[in-house]
């Protein structure tokens, strides 16, 4: 016995294979890279990848739209990666505590998490807020992303500033996320 909803979910997954493979491959690559270099940072590493993907998915790029078979489906995955990001960040915040890095790095990280959590709350309250106000508040996530990048690079230091697979992966996702965020905020 199959319902319409089950059929729609199957249709989403069957038509969106390229897009879903892109997301899954990004997470697998992230997991494998962090497992082989600094396994204790896998959770925040996945959070960075997820946040970067969230920005990339919000760009409305025609390529992504074709991979997911429609903008609506791209935004469904965008919401999922945003939610996954905040869950991973909260888990990271509780599991790492104040164990690593400087006090300033920790403050950047905490501030970023508070901004992310606030914006997720605003996103879910969006239907009660005028669209223009919601859109500008939602853009503050870019500030949180930048603070999070400062946090990461202050904590990881030389591991991310020397050329290796980890620095290439983190740098690539960070740069793609920054470029996507800039594009979203300033160019459309």
PLM feature spans:
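Extreme N-terminal basic, low-complexity initiation segments
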Residues: 2-6
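Membrane-embedded alpha-helical bundles that constitute the cytochrome b-like, heme-associated redox core
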Residues: 7-188
């Amino acid at each position: 016995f199959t319902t319409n909803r089950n059929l729609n979910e199957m249709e989403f997954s069957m038509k969106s294979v390229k897009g879903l493979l892109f997301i899954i491959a990004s997470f697998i690559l992230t997991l494998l890279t962090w497992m082989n270099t600094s396994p204790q940072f896998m959770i925040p590493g996945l959070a960075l990848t997820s946040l970067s993907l969230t920005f990339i998915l919000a760009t409305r790029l025609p390529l992504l739209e074709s991979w997911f078979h429609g903008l609506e489906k791209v935004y469904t995955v965008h919401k999922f990666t945003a939610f996954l990001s905040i869950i991973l960040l909260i888990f990271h915040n509780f599991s790492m505590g104040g164990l690593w890095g400087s006090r300033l790095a920790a403050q950047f990280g905490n501030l970023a998490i508070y901004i992310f959590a606030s914006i997720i709350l605003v996103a879910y309250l969006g239907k009660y807020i005028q669209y223009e106000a919601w859109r500008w508040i939602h853009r503050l996530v870019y500030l949180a992303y930048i603070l999070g990048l400062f946090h990461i690079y202050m904590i990881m230091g030389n591991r991310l500033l020397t050329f290796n697979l980890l620095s290439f992966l983190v740098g690539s996702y960070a740069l793609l996320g920054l470029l996507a965020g800039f594009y979203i905020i300033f160019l459309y």
